[in-house]
């Protein structure tokens, strides 16, 4: 593992294995399965063998941290998240976990400068996506609900064990929503695994995001309940607030029944939302496709000292 690079490897939904200065962490922790098996070419035990030092939790729904307890049991990783996230994982594990608690109330933030040597981390509490009333006056967007592809299930049928795991974790509590920014040398990466309608429900979060150091790479969830009425309007609020140089969608794969969708089918909507920004403010889009981009660290290997990141 190179200690002079920042490396991220996607393993489904918004979960990444990441290396910062040679220190391995996870952001979210679920290998998608249950509606299929083997679609993502890894499993929780293999992820745990990366020996992560921390698991940064965005929120506690099944599709984000259903494997956290198992990975903690094998690796001893500490949890970074709200107290509710830690409590949920402790309940699943049946024992205490190392917990670095961050604020849960939207708009509150915390600086975590001593977790990873040479890495500064900002944790900002924000809000989950929600159903929205149509906002035709704000860009005249059409609905773009995800269209599930049952072909992936037919080609990769779920094992009884994987299906049972999915069902068992469906009730997992959300426990708050946290956005993280990781800063190494000149490089700043901002990641979040949901997008709420900030303008109406949490304008204080927009102000917090604008005050973060400039974002170079923005990894943002696409799936949102608001798609049913306003397509990716909520996503646009985060992109406008963070003003990144590079944008990469996440949580845009066919991860489960009915609400999953293939990345290729969501791509036109992502490009439309980014295209609504003024031309000078549009980030470059680094689009990824399931299942081809899973476990492809070359897609997200960065030299944090490169001049291109200097503002």
Predicted regions and their residues:
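Short active-site oxyanion
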Residues: 5-7, 73-78, 189
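Residues that mark the start of a beta-strand
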Residues: 7, 23-24, 120, 179, ...
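Active-site neighborhood of phospho(di)ester-bond hydrolases with catalytic His/Asp-centered motifs
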Residues: 26-30, 51-61, 80-83, 189-195, ...
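Active-site environment of divalent metal-dependent phosphoester hydrolases
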Residues: 34, 61-66, 86-89, 106-111, ...
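Binuclear metal-ion centers of metallo-dependent hydrolases, dominated by the metallo-beta-lactamase
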Residues: 78-79, 86-115, 232-311
């Amino acid at each position: 593992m190179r200690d002079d690079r920042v490396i991220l490897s996607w393993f489904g939904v918004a979960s990444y294995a990441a290396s910062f200065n040679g220190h391995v962490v996870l952001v979210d922790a679920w290998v998608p399965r249950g509606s299929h098996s083997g679609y993502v070419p890894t499993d929780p035990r293999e992820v745990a063998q990366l020996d992560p030092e921390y698991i940064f939790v965005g929120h506690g729904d099944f599709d984000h941290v259903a494997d956290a307890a198992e990975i903690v049991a094998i690796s001893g990783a500490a949890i970074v998240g709200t107290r509710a996230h830690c409590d949920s994982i402790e309940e699943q594990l049946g024992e205490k976990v190392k917990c670095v608690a961050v604020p849960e109330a939207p708009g509150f933030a915390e600086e975590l400068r001593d977790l990873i040597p040479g890495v500064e981390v900002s944790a900002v509490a924000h809000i989950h996506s929600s159903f929205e009333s149509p906002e035709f006056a704000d860009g005249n967007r059409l609905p773009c609900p995800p269209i599930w592809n049952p072909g992936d299930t037919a080609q990769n049928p779920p094992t009884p064990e994987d299906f049972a795991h999915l069902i068992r974790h469906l009730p997992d509590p959300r426990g708050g929503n946290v956005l993280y920014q990781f800063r190494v040398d000149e490089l700043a990466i901002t990641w979040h695994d949901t997008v709420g309608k900030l303008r109406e429900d949490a304008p204080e979060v927009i102000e917090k995001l604008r005050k973060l150091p400039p974002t170079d790479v923005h990894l943002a969830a696409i799936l949102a309940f608001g798609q049913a009425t306003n397509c990716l309007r909520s996503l646009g609020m985060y992109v406008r607030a963070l003003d990144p140089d590079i944008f990469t969608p996440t949580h845009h794969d066919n991860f489960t029944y009915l609400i999953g969708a293939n990345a290729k089918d969501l791509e036109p909507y992502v490009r439309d939302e980014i295209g609504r920004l003024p031309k000078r403010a549009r980030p470059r889009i680094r689009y990824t496709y399931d299942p081809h981009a899973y476990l492809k660290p070359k897609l997200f290997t960065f030299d944090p000292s490169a001049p291109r990141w200097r503002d």
